[in-house]
């Protein structure tokens, strides 16, 4: 494990030169050591803490004191908040429960939270599942990852497990490290050998623990075992160093060519030697640093040929292109819905499983997606940044504002595919579609029509005459709550539905829609008998009674029947009778009574 923070012996000339240049940025050797220590100390102290053994101390009090010290050095409560410390603990456990073949790959990305681990795994699974040619920058990484999952021997059969390879590497590492130090001293002098020794000494908080840690961090957790020098050192092999097949110092993967060795060392989890000058974040690969720096520079070199949108990374561009190709390779087994990204499918499947990972700290309500929690929190903060320019009403979500604006414009973007009926709100469309999608198993005993359960209850009020919704001002009652709401606007004077063309306002949305057809000239309701067209469905129904002879309105006094319940407008009466004022007044009074009830009022 010393190779984790030491300068590796098999680095090529360019890599060693890069480290030298990096070292010159610091004024003293102590500054350089401090920089290296800060980069790796948190992970080192975590491993010291987890693998600390009781046998290393003289008694329980010293053991407890040492554990507290190591935990303090790892979690750093003086600089981290409680939430950050909890996230570190969750992240550690998450990495621990991952399959061993995935741990090395995830740790190479150096995630700082559990969410970053999820993103790395989802991206990896998606890229490995994608058919065709992969991104060239990651091809070597994918091949290396597959090699780590199922390493093959000479005969093409699976070789020893990864854990066995690690154990073998542990026994071979002292000899190999000694030979690497000799090569390094020959090529570059003793400067880097001394630097490596200084860094190693600086990272030793307690004598025996460091030695134990360098021998094997992963195996020393089994407390009580003793590791004597003669037990961990093998006899030198008869073959020369040139005859040995090179292996990775981190996970023991065999490498056939020197070029593969160099590429693998760049991929394998190790030191983050590439640091960002702007924010100080470090990376293990230069390509990752280059892509990260575009956040500060604003550079977006990868441009979509279809829409011209630009991106910082090639992988993000590839994901974006799925929008144009329409490819949706990830399909839900429950409902058959397809998605362009695996992460989107994963989120969708929570609707079926009922998983809700995101909880509100204020009320405890849970959500399956982070966006849902984000919008919900605004209920508690009373944050309503989206304001309607027509009525100044504010909303917490832009989508709700867009739907609300349909009240003023009369727009109904949500249309039913079955019957063509349109709605302002998507929720109204969903409720309406239950009529088509749900089985109509509830039949009215009066007329034989079938409804859903809620629809039948509302329909039966027509036969029973029940009107549960009553106006508190005039005591008029209605079958539906929506009818009461529209009626109450007569008393309040509210006219929320305004015409954009002439400014005229209405109490009902349906009246506004019909009025707007005056400006557009639209007459969508056509009579099949004579071809006459009308702006509203009510006008068509009244007209069709001419052909059918239907007269549903009957006078209670004499029994005379009428086709419509029309009231003559006040303006029309006064204009027609301006020469005879008394007659106009009489007609005006009679107009207050429906046509089918005024036929017998001879006293007027």
UniProtKB/Swiss-Prot annotation:
> Which species is this UniProt entry from?
Macaca nemestrina (Pig-tailed macaque)
A Pfam entry, by short name: zf-C2H2
TM helices/strands, residue ranges: none
The UniProt entry lists the main location of this chain as: nucleus
Zn fingers (C2H2-type): where?
A: 274-296, 302-324, 330-352, 358-380, 386-408, 414-436, 442-463, 469-491, 497-519, 525-547, 553-578
Name it: Zinc finger and SCAN domain-containing protein 12
What family does the database annotate?
Belongs to the krueppel C2H2-type zinc-finger protein family.
Cellular location(s) = Nucleus
Location of region: Disordered: 204-267
Entry keyword set: DNA-binding, Isopeptide bond, Metal-binding, Nucleus, Repeat, Transcription, Transcription regulation, Ubl conjugation, Zinc, Zinc-finger
Q: Name one GO molecular function term.
A: RNA polymerase II cis-regulatory region sequence-specific DNA binding
The Polar residues compositionally biased stretches are 207-221
Q: Sorted alphabetically, which SMART domains does this protein's record hold?
A: SCAN, ZnF_C2H2
Q: Which residues form the SCAN box domain?
A: 46-128
Function, as annotated: May be involved in transcriptional regulation.
Q: Which cysteines are joined by disulfide bonds?
A: none
């Amino acid at each position: 494990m010393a190779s984790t923070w030491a300068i590796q012996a098999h680095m090529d000339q360019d890599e060693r030169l890069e480290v030298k240049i990096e070292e010159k940025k610091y004024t003293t050797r102590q500054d350089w050591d401090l920089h290296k220590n800060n980069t790796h100390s948190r992970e080192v102290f975590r491993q010291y803490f987890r693998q600390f053994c009781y046998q290393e101390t003289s008694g329980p009090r010293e053991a407890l004191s040492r554990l507290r010290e190591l935990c303090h050095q790892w979690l750093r409560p003086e600089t981290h908040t409680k939430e950050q410390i909890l996230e570190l603990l969750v992240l550690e456990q998450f990495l621990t429960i991952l399959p061993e073949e995935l741990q090395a790959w995830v740790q190479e990305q150096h995630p700082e939270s559990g969410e970053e681990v999820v993103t790395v795994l989802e991206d990896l699974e998606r890229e490995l599942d994608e058919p065709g040619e992969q991104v060239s920058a990651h091809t070597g990484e994918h091949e290396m990852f597959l090699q780590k999952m199922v390493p093959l021997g000479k005969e093409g059969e699976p070789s020893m497990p990864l854990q066995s390879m690690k154990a073998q590497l542990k026994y071979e590492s002292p000899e190999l490290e000694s030979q690497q130090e000799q090569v390094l001293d020959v090529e570059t002098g003793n400067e880097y050998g001394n630097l490596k020794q200084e860094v190693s000494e600086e990272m030793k908080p307690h004598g025996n623990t460091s030695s134990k840690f360098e021998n094997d961090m992963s195996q020393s957790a089994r407390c009580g075992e003793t590791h004597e020098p003669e037990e961990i050192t093998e006899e030198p092999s008869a073959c020369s160093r040139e005859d040995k097949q090179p292996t990775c110092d981190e996970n023991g993967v065999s490498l056939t060519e020197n070029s593969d060795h160099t590429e693998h060392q760049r991929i394998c989890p190790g030191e983050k030697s590439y640091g960002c000058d702007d924010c100080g974040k470090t990376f293990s690969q230069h390509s990752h640093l280059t892509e990260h720096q575009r956040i500060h520079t604003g550079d977006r070199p990868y441009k979509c040929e279809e829409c011209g949108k630009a991106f910082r990374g090639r992988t993000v561009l590839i994901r974006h292109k799925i929008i144009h190709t329409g490819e949706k390779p990830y399909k839900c087994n429950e409902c058959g819905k397809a998605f362009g990204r695996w992460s989107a499918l994963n989120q969708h499947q929570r609707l079926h499983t009922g998983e809700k990972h995101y909880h509100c700290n204020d009320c405890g309500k849970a959500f399956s997606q982070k966006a849902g929690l984000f919008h919900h929190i605004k209920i508690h903060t009373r944050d309503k940044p989206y304001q309607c320019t027509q009525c100044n009403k504010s909303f917490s979500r832009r989508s709700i504002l867009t739907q609300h604006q349909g009240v003023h414009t009369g727009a109904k973007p949500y249309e039913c595919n079955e019957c063509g009926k349109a709605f302002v709100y998507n929720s109204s469309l969903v409720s309406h579609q239950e009529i088509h999608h749900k089985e109509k198993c509830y039949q009215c005993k009066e007329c034989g029509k079938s409804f859903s359960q809620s629809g039948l209850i509302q329909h039966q009020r027509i036969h029973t005459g029940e009107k549960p919704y009553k106006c508190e001002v005039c005591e008029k009652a209605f079958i539906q709550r929506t009818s009461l709401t529209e009626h109450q606007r007569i008393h309040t004077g509210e006219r929320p539905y305004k015409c954009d063309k002439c400014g005229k306002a209405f109490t009902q949305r349906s009246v506004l829609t019909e009025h707007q057809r005056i400006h557009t000239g639209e007459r969508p309701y056509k009579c099949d008998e004579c071809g006459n067209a009308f702006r509203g469905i009510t006008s068509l129904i009244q007209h069709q009674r001419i052909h059918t002879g239907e007269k549903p309105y009957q006078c209670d006094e004499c029994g005379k029947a009428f086709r419509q319940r029309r009231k003559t407008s006040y303006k029309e009466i006064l204009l027609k009778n301006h020469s005879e004022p008394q007659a106009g007044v009489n007609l005006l009074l009679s107009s207050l009574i429906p046509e089918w009830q005024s036929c017998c009022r001879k006293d007027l």
